[in-house]
Amino acid sequence: MKAKVIVGMSGGVDSSVAAWLLKEQGYQVEGLFMKNWEQDDHNDFCPAAKDLADAQAVCNQLRIPLHTVNFSKEYWDRVFAYFLSEYEKGRTPNPDVLCNKEIKFNAFLNHALNLGADYIATGHYAKNTIEGSIGYLFKAKDREKDQTYFLHAVEPEALSKTIFPIGDFTKPQIREFAKQLGLVTHAKKDSTGICFIGEKRFKTFLNEFILAKPGEIKSTGGKTLGQHDGLMFYTLGQRQGLGIGGLQNSTDEPWYVVDKDIASNTLYVAQGSQHPMLYSQGLICGPIHWLADYENHLPLTCFAKTRYRQTDQACMISPPDNNLHYVIFSSPQRAITPGQFIVFYEKNQCLGGATIEQIIR
């Protein structure tokens, strides 16, 4: 009898096909739907009820059981509280990374093991290899959809208990499988944005949890150009929503956010998409979460991404200094954002990553 695998069923096409592929390979397959957010019952946040119905319909079609579990408290404590605290500091967090680390490959994994699973599986576009109790992470075949950026913080031990069934396929192939099988999710749109915000405007959502502190918008030369609604609403490189067009004695070039001074609550902007203040030669990151044995090989020349879907950028990682690493790039990088993550690669292997703490201009 093949191993028992519990698949995280999101109600989307990727996890639907992942479950089918595992069943085709002879595994004992069961599904599990996680509810991670409580406040979607009375408003327009994540359509959890619709997703659950789709997950149940797919499991019925595949003739596999579906478990449900509520991780809302774990999500609030381990992901959302961090999300809010980072925004309060004027930084731009990435909750998807923490959700994978704390919920999908921790709370879900432990719950599945308690249900008798040998492995969990998800619909992530990624690959892994397993050596004993350690798993190694690799890019998916579909480079456009590769999600290793969001998986870099998962523990190697958790990766050794994980199967990524769709890592060797492209998104169009997955859609075609689902269509041929007649799965109800075959034409369902991919989810985008931060899950707990749903269709709600980001500014409206944040205002429900954090008190906004308006302040001055200044040019890099120190001239006051207007007022911002609160530093938490802006990210480096942002162009839209600044409300400072048509200023006297300025060109028609668009304005971009180039810096945030938390101490003075000032938003700094500059004109032109190629303004030097938009670019950085490097960054300082926190402790690196390693997924491969490179910790003792620093300084290390490798590749990195500072945001999802960015082309890999050549860089050098310094040895740690008070748990911080200096990362210098071969060419200047645009709009590196503190609070986001830098993720390191060597060819197709994901080496790990860290939180971006500071920019080096």
Swiss-Prot record:
<keyword id="KW-1015">Disulfide bond</keyword>
<feature type="disulfide bond" description="Alternate">
    <location>
        <begin position="99"/>
        <end position="195"/>
    </location>
</feature>
<dbReference type="InterPro" id="IPR014729">
    <property type="entry name" value="Rossmann-like_a/b/a_fold"/>
</dbReference>
<dbReference type="Pfam" id="PF20258">
    <property type="entry name" value="tRNA_Me_trans_C"/>
</dbReference>
<comment type="function">
    <text>Catalyzes the 2-thiolation of uridine at the wobble position (U34) of tRNA, leading to the formation of s(2)U34.</text>
</comment>
<feature type="active site" description="Nucleophile">
    <location>
        <position position="99"/>
    </location>
</feature>
<feature type="binding site">
    <location>
        <position position="123"/>
    </location>
    <ligand>
        <name>ATP</name>
    </ligand>
</feature>
<dbReference type="InterPro" id="IPR046885">
    <property type="entry name" value="MnmA-like_C"/>
</dbReference>
<dbReference type="GO" id="GO:0103016">
    <property type="term" value="F:tRNA-uridine 2-sulfurtransferase activity"/>
</dbReference>
<dbReference type="InterPro" id="IPR046884">
    <property type="entry name" value="MnmA-like_central"/>
</dbReference>
<comment type="similarity">
    <text>Belongs to the MnmA/TRMU family.</text>
</comment>
<keyword id="KW-0819">tRNA processing</keyword>
<feature type="region of interest" description="Interaction with tRNA">
    <location>
        <begin position="145"/>
        <end position="147"/>
    </location>
</feature>
<feature type="site" description="Interaction with tRNA">
    <location>
        <position position="124"/>
    </location>
</feature>
<feature type="region of interest" description="Interaction with tRNA">
    <location>
        <begin position="307"/>
        <end position="308"/>
    </location>
</feature>
<keyword id="KW-0808">Transferase</keyword>
<protein>
    <recommendedName>
        <fullName>tRNA-specific 2-thiouridylase MnmA</fullName>
        <ecNumber>2.8.1.13</ecNumber>
    </recommendedName>
</protein>
<dbReference type="GO" id="GO:0002143">
    <property type="term" value="P:tRNA wobble position uridine thiolation"/>
</dbReference>
<dbReference type="InterPro" id="IPR023382">
    <property type="entry name" value="MnmA-like_central_sf"/>
</dbReference>
<keyword id="KW-0820">tRNA-binding</keyword>
<dbReference type="Pfam" id="PF20259">
    <property type="entry name" value="tRNA_Me_trans_M"/>
</dbReference>
<keyword id="KW-0547">Nucleotide-binding</keyword>
<keyword id="KW-0067">ATP-binding</keyword>
<keyword id="KW-0963">Cytoplasm</keyword>
<dbReference type="GO" id="GO:0000049">
    <property type="term" value="F:tRNA binding"/>
</dbReference>
<feature type="region of interest" description="Interaction with target base in tRNA">
    <location>
        <begin position="94"/>
        <end position="96"/>
    </location>
</feature>
<keyword id="KW-0694">RNA-binding</keyword>
<dbReference type="Pfam" id="PF03054">
    <property type="entry name" value="tRNA_Me_trans"/>
</dbReference>
<feature type="site" description="Interaction with tRNA">
    <location>
        <position position="340"/>
    </location>
</feature>
<feature type="binding site">
    <location>
        <position position="34"/>
    </location>
    <ligand>
        <name>ATP</name>
    </ligand>
</feature>
<dbReference type="GO" id="GO:0005524">
    <property type="term" value="F:ATP binding"/>
</dbReference>
<feature type="active site" description="Cysteine persulfide intermediate">
    <location>
        <position position="195"/>
    </location>
</feature>
<feature type="binding site">
    <location>
        <begin position="8"/>
        <end position="15"/>
    </location>
    <ligand>
        <name>ATP</name>
    </ligand>
</feature>
<dbReference type="GO" id="GO:0005737">
    <property type="term" value="C:cytoplasm"/>
</dbReference>
<dbReference type="InterPro" id="IPR004506">
    <property type="entry name" value="MnmA-like"/>
</dbReference>
